[in-house]
């Protein structure tokens, strides 16, 4: 067995021993030893391999697999620009604390700076965006290297999981490979062996970060449950503004009701990413702000946080009048939103979000696109307790969302997956629908596209003010006029153009036995009245 083949075989074997079950692979020559080893492991049923031709979308596929599967997922590619295409997925994984492993093949280091083709200084390419950058030395005809290879894999997985730091995230694992890059079918030689019984070479225990924080909940307290939050039993019963991806610790509070409440104290769990009303409360110097996190970082955009911890030691009790006020105002806001939706003459993204949220049932998985869909979902309803909600909120970009939805659906076997996206988000990553024949496909993924022919979110921001109407449509509205049915046909994906009523019916109708695969349900919406619709809701409060 030649050195590169031996090294790749040991690395893949140790990844499996370390708990890896899904791997995404992009074709290339320099990563051929890894490709052969991964294909063999896939045929043996030790892992599931996903082939993709575009490294950028492949990175987000791996991200979706990792988020939904709650395991590290390697994405394997050749050298050069192939590695650089992982940049957006690495950024998202960093800020969302997702265990993504970028396993890049590299040229031998003596080729750097020589003008060799497809050769760049890729070690360290991701800088501070990864938890660790780990490289292997060039493989030699030396059986003693087996322990070094396997030990390095265990370090990679430990860093990705955050087992010693409490801070999961992406890792760059760079492996220089020297020719021959293909196995010698006539002289295989001994396979590098791991620990007996399939054990990992190095076992690492999960570190527990336990920092108690004293919290008196007698003052009027609001809990802000942000992305990545853990459920906090000690905060049960407290009024909570929860993002769709975050747990609801206590009494639900509609984000649009928050300006009317005037809390004296706010407790952050996770990282708030959505609402301006939340940001204003957290920036108010008259509000005492505390932060509870599960890792070493804590959010504090305004610099107002008084204390941090990983758990609260609660004293006191909330005033019953405060609890009742929060509940009453929130219920009033919920009704105002639904009333204005019913009165609005045309379908908007809010209407589509309401139809989707109302159709979800226990066991469903929902993936929300960035920009308006995740905000719309937060305004129309809080997900049912047994609906799993995902969204790329690390950096909150629209890129890679179709691929992330495909990955999430592939990793989730317990029920169906529904993705709610805007048209620009869908178009930005339409190549995520490209799945090769014979490749694993989602069993049941419905992608709902609210198509308002452009960037609806800008209608609600400062740029959407009528005084900028002469500039708005071209540079912010960005109408595209694309035929989504034709686009889906090119990818051989089922597509239906539906109204709100038909959307509700299709989402609420039980599936027939068997695999549905992927389907796209497109709803034509309008964005020109969004600003007025939101203003009408606020006027009812």
UniProtKB/Swiss-Prot annotation:
Among the record's GO biological process terms, what is one?
menaquinone biosynthetic process
Q: EC no.?
A: 2.2.1.9
EC class name: transferase
Q: Give the pathway annotation.
A: Quinol/quinone metabolism; 1,4-dihydroxy-2-naphthoate biosynthesis; 1,4-dihydroxy-2-naphthoate from chorismate: step 2/7; Quinol/quinone metabolism; menaquinone biosynthesis
Tell me the keywords, alphabetical order: Magnesium, Manganese, Menaquinone biosynthesis, Metal-binding, Thiamine pyrophosphate, Transferase
Q: Which reaction does it catalyse?
A: isochorismate + 2-oxoglutarate + H(+) = 5-enolpyruvoyl-6-hydroxy-2-succinyl-cyclohex-3-ene-1-carboxylate + CO2
Which Gene3D superfamilies would you find in this protein's record?
3.40.50.970
Tell me where on the tree of life, at the top rank, the source sits: Bacteria
Q: Which cofactor does it need?
A: Mg(2+); Mn(2+); thiamine diphosphate
Cofactor descriptive note: Binds 1 thiamine pyrophosphate per subunit.
Record-linked Pfam families: TPP_enzyme_C, TPP_enzyme_N
| Molecular function via GO | 2-succinyl-5-enolpyruvyl-6-hydroxy-3-cyclohexene-1-carboxylic-acid synthase activity; magnesium ion binding; manganese ion binding; thiamine pyrophosphate binding
Self-association and partners: Homodimer.
The entry's function note states:
Catalyzes the thiamine diphosphate-dependent decarboxylation of 2-oxoglutarate and the subsequent addition of the resulting succinic semialdehyde-thiamine pyrophosphate anion to isochorismate to yield 2-succinyl-5-enolpyruvyl-6-hydroxy-3-cyclohexene-1-carboxylate (SEPHCHC).
User: Which family does the record claim for this protein?
Assistant: Belongs to the TPP enzyme family. MenD subfamily.
Query: What is the recorded name of this protein?
Result: 2-succinyl-5-enolpyruvyl-6-hydroxy-3-cyclohexene-1-carboxylate synthase
Q: Which organism is it from?
A: Rhodococcus opacus (strain B4)
Q: Taxonomic lineage per UniProt?
A: Bacteria, Bacillati, Actinomycetota, Actinomycetes, Mycobacteriales
